[in-house]
Swiss-Prot record:
This is DNA ligase. Belongs to the NAD-dependent DNA ligase family. LigA subfamily. Its cofactor is Mg(2+); Mn(2+). It comes from Treponema pallidum (strain Nichols). NCBIfam families: dnlj. The keyword Zinc applies. NAD(+) binds at D31, D32, A33, F34, D35, S73, Q74, R121, E163, K275, K296. Its EC number is 6.5.1.2. It holds the Pfam family DNA_ligase_aden.
Length: 823
């Protein structure tokens, strides 16, 4: 038997097992994970009989009855490409889009207008009779009015289809120990005593005339799906939320909007049902109707195969990273997944070849969550026992695999890299650090400041000009905040955020930090005994290097904040993807004495929100349940707060230059100021003048479309005109108060791209728009500002939709001009 055949057999067993758990017990995997198993079976064995079967929710001792029309399943689309292919194949005139309710399917049968019985899906042909429980549910209608037949005066005989759901607030208050609403509904439906049935709602979406086995007999009082929903509503049924879309692009746009706001719904949905607006009786009787599809939300979980485990080093810590077969997850292709620590390998019983469930819930690297199955030929995972750098025997505490050697080269290298990252020293990349470290030119942080041009020129591909640029970048950062200084030494558990906590707790000078004890540190909020010990031990090991940096004048620690700093004592947390919530904003807050937090806690001052994300909901909960004095403000309110703080700084004489931390490259010949004069002004205002275009560049000052101009476009670097540079320089008279439109020239604009671009890829164009404050849409709608297309004839579907919607179509050249204000 081949490997593929063995996998097919394994998939059959898994699917049958999870179908039974789904309908008759607590489901032990997510819908996304089950769909992944189904799709894998369809790929390996398209003709497998199991793919044509329908799962059963039947109980063996329940009374069985036949459906009026078989309850089939639906085709599924997990992404825009799959949905667009389905839409193109079926060429429907219009689309009816409905919430895909996450509940239990139900058929209510009526005879001459009177309720007879209620059936679950069962095996699709016959279902369990749950009549007694349904009578007590919300939304149940016992008698229908005489609105049937050619004259509209006959009582209805047939079935009404719907979904039994539970609202999320009911689930939270009455069934907190149950996994989810659907599992709870399934359990209540099958109770013989009817307990809990009043907590359930019936939401309807279909009506089928006829009798069991003889569907669609008799005339209809409606002509299409929209009129059907109206008829159901007139009868007193609660109907599913529906929306009519003219084309596939509108469906995609609607899905994106609902994905953003679905947490506000009182019930759970896991996608949308998209169907034809026309009635088609023959199609409705198919096991999987062709003219409707379940348009699922972006997959957050998937099943794949673990092929290898690589051990990634961060300092002296070894972290396992799982290498898997490629799988689509939340709109991206995933091949690497985090395994956290050796404990996870043991806990999940993982082996090379295991089928695993991975998730991606906002994390950059997806995480392996669970073991699905392990084939017989799977191999054990090798856990390293010796340090790859110093050959010291590694210590495995379960939660961490690490080298205990305090003089391990890995630790020294990590500290140097961390220092470069914290100080944001440009032009010193990981490859250069590695070469300097290997050639023993830099083995400690102070060694960076004793480098000479000759040292650097000896490194391959480093010339005299580059060497000077590197040295200038290293020595440019002279004054450093205390929390940055401490974080730069890579002490385990201490980044800038925890450094700020130290300062807020009274350790606001290096001398106080150096003399801190475990007992004094463990009393600080979010510091425990272990972290306190780690900090004290780590500080002791790097104390000499810290003192050398300061004693030799390589760097200086900024004087501690004065009490009059306008944001002193205030802390901020950002929720969602703010258009201005970038690194420059964080620097601006810190320059004014404020603190930036990564999570919502009791002592937070402000939450700046753009969307109803998890931090927003946590903040609301803290305010409501614990009476926390936390202000939740919009981004516009936040900007006004910063402006007021900036004005306060101006009155007190405190200045923070608007070009601090910004880098510029000058392209072409200036019309009104020579390069040297412009560069002097930029440097005087705290900016940095770059000699080449790299991904780290902030601005390219545009005079002509040189090669470097095109390189900057491709890298997504903001391109500004000479006039815009004048505006930036002029803001020096009003420190920190910058014109939002200078930094975000596309603010308030939305763009959609059609076809290929000449000067950059679509991904680069999207990155450029987002960097300049604009938004990117995947479909054309009346809310769109511009459609970017190089099609001179406007024959694409997006161009045609733009014409119908009154959206302006612009070329790539005009698009680049918009990205370059002042030209």
């Amino acid at each position: 038997m081949s490997t593929a055949q063995r996998r097919v057999q394994e998939l059959e067993k898994l699917i049958l097992h999870h179908q039974d758990r789904y309908y008759n017990a607590e489901s032990d995997i997510s819908d996304d994970a089950f769909d992944a198993l189904w799709e894998e079976l369809a790929r390996l064995d398209p003709g497998n009989p199991l793919l044509k079967a329908i799962g059963s929710d039947s109980q063996r001792d329940a009374v069985k009855k036949r459906h009026i029309v078989p309850m089939g399943s639906q085709h599924k689309a997990a992404d825009e490409e799959s949905f667009s292919a389905w839409a193109k194949k079926n060429a429907l005139q219009a689309f009816l889009v409905q919430h895909k309710l996450d509940g239990v399917s139900l058929e209510l049968q009526y005879e001459r207008g009177h309720f007879c019985c209620a059936l679950t899906r069962g095996n699709g042909i016959v279902g369990d009779d749950v009549t007694a429980n349904v009578r007590g549910m919300r939304g149940f209608v016992p008698t229908l009015t005489a609105e049937w037949g050619p004259c509209g005066n006959l009582p209805f005989t047939g079935g009404v289809r719907g979904e039994v759901i539970m609202h999320k607030d009911i689930h939270r208050s009455h069934y907190p120990t149950h996994a989810n609403c659907r599992n709870t509904v399934n359990g209540i439906l099958k109770r013989k005593d009817g307990r809990g049935r009043t907590h359930l709602h019936i939401v309807c979406y279909d009506a089928v005339p006829g009798t069991p086995g003889k569907p669609f007999t008799g005339s209809l009082p409606f002509a299409d799906e929209t009129e059907k929903l109206a008829w159901l509503a007139r009868q007193g049924f609660v109907t599913v939320h529906s929306h009519r879309c003219a084309n596939a692009q509108e469906v995609v746009a609607l899905r994106s909007e609902i994905m953003r706001t679905r947490e506000l719904l009182p019930y759970s949905i896991d996608g949308l049902v998209v169907k034809s607006t026309d009635l088609d009786f023959q199609d409705a009787q198919l096991p999987r109707p062709k003219k409707q599809i379940a348009f699922k939300f972006s997959t957050q979980e998937a099943i794949t195969t673990l092929r290898d485990v690589q051990w990634q080093t961060s300092g002296v810590t070894y972290t396992p990273i799982g290498i898997t077969d490629p799988v689509r997850l939340a709109g991206t292709t995933v091949k690497r997944a985090n395994l956290c620590n050796p404990n996870m390998l043991t806990k999940l019983c993982l082996k090379i070849g295991s089928h695993v469930l991975i998730s991606k819930r906002g994390e950059i690297i997806p995480k392996i969550e669970a073991l699905v199955s392990t084939p017989a030929h799977a191999q054990e995972i090798h856990i390293p026992t010796q340090c790859t750098s110093c050959n010291t025997v590694l210590e495995n505490s379960g939660s961490r695999l690490f080298c205990p050697n305090v003089n391990c080269p890995l630790l020294s290298h990590h500290r140097i890299t961390r220092w470069i990252e914290c100080l944001e020293i440009k032009h010193v990349g990981t490859e250069l650090i590695q070469r300097l470290f290997e050639e023993k030119k830099v083995r400690r942080i102070p060694d960076l400041y004793t480098l000479t041009c000759e040292d650097l020129i000896e490194i391959e591909h480093v010339g005299n000009a580059t060497a000077k640029k590197i040295l200038e970048a290293i020595h440019h950062k002279k004054e450093i905040a205390l929390q940055t200084f401490i974080a730069g030494f890579g002490i385990e558990g201490i980044g800038e955020t925890m450094g700020e906590k130290l300062i807020c707790a009274g350790f606001d000078t290096l001398e106080k930090v150096l003399h801190a004890t475990t007992e004094t540190l463990e009393s600080i909020y979010q510091f425990g005994t272990e972290l306190a010990k780690s900090v004290v031990t780590g500080i002791a090991r790097v104390k000499d290097d810290m003192c050398e940096l300061l004693d030799r004048g390589f760097v200086r620690i900024l004087a501690k904040q004065q009490a009059e700093s306008p944001l002193r004592g205030k802390s901020f947390c950002f929720s969602g993807s703010l258009r201005n919530g970038d690194r420059a904003t964080i620097h601006r807050i810190r320059a004014l004495g404020g603190v930036v937090r990564t999570s919502v806690t009791r002592d937070l001052s402000y939450l700046i929100f753009e969307s109803l994300s998890q931090p927003y909901r946590t903040a609301q909960k803290l305010k409501k349940e614990q009476g926390v004095a936390l202000e939740i403000i919009s981004e516009d309110e936040f900007c006004r707060l910063l402006d007021q703080a900036s004005a306060s700084c101006t009155h007190t004489g405190e200045t923070v230059h608007p070009l601090q931390g910004k880098s510029f490259y000058f392209s072409g010949a200036s019309r009104s100021m020579n390069h040297k004069h412009a560069q002097e002004k930029v440097r005087a205002l705290g900016g940095d003048v770059a000699s080449s275009v790299t991904a780290q560049l902030d601005y390219l000052v545009f005079y002509s479309q040189s090669t470097r101009y095109r390189t900057a476009c491709a890298l997504g670097i903001q391109i500004i005109s000479e006039e815009t540079l004048h505006k930036l320089i002029a803001t020096a008279q009003s420190p920190l108060h910058t014109d939002a439109h200078v930094h975000a020239p596309l603010h308030g604009m939305s763009f959609c791209f059609s076809g290929d671009l000449d000067g950059m890829t679509r991904a680069q164009a999207i990155a450029l728009v987002q960097r300049l404050g604009g938004t990117v849409k995947t479909a054309v709608s009346t809310q769109l500002t511009y459609l970017v297309s190089n099609d001179p004839h406007g024959q694409s579907r997006k161009c045609q939709n733009a014409v119908r919607c009154g959206v302006r179509i612009i070329s790539e050249h005009v698009f680049l001009a918009l990205c370059t204000p002042g030209t």
